[in-house]
Amino acid sequence: VDYYTPVQRLLARRFPLVSARIEAGFPSPADDHLEGELDLNELLIQNAPATFFVRARGDSMNGERPTIQDGDLLVVDKSRTPKTGDVVIACLDGAFTVKRLRCTAEGVWLMPENKAFPEIRIEAGQEFCIWGVVTARISQFH
């Protein structure tokens, strides 16, 4: 995980939001109307002072679900209370990692999406904290 500074609210800039669902086939010319405008601040950032960007490294979260690819930009909110099922940035024994959080009566685990990587059970005596909850993933195709 590469770290970036806290989010500064971007200048408000609205982009056209097309109301039609985009099929992964041939587009329909009848669906060329706008639903409204979209502000990326409103979409991605709920609490600017507690929001950071981090860049993912590795492929432990590249699996069956919507995945996190190597190089993806993650939006992380440190003010959110983590819960089971959330993708989190965790610090375990001084090392940061991005994993899915699983909490049960038997313990706490950090779960990779990629089955080639082991589940990490948090053991007594380990230095562990949740640094923030991942709220969005930004991937670039080029």
Model-derived features: where do they sit?
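Low-complexity, intrinsically disordered Gly/Pro/Thr-rich segments
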Residues: 113-124
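Structural motif
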Residues: 69-72, 86
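Residue-level "contact hotspot" at macromolecular interaction interfaces
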Residues: 64-68, 81
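Short, compositionally biased
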Residues: 84-98, 102-108
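Short, solvent-exposed secondary-structure boundary/capping segments
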Residues: 29, 108-113
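Short, positionally conserved secondary-structure boundary motifs
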Residues: 1-64, 95-96, 103, 118-119, ...
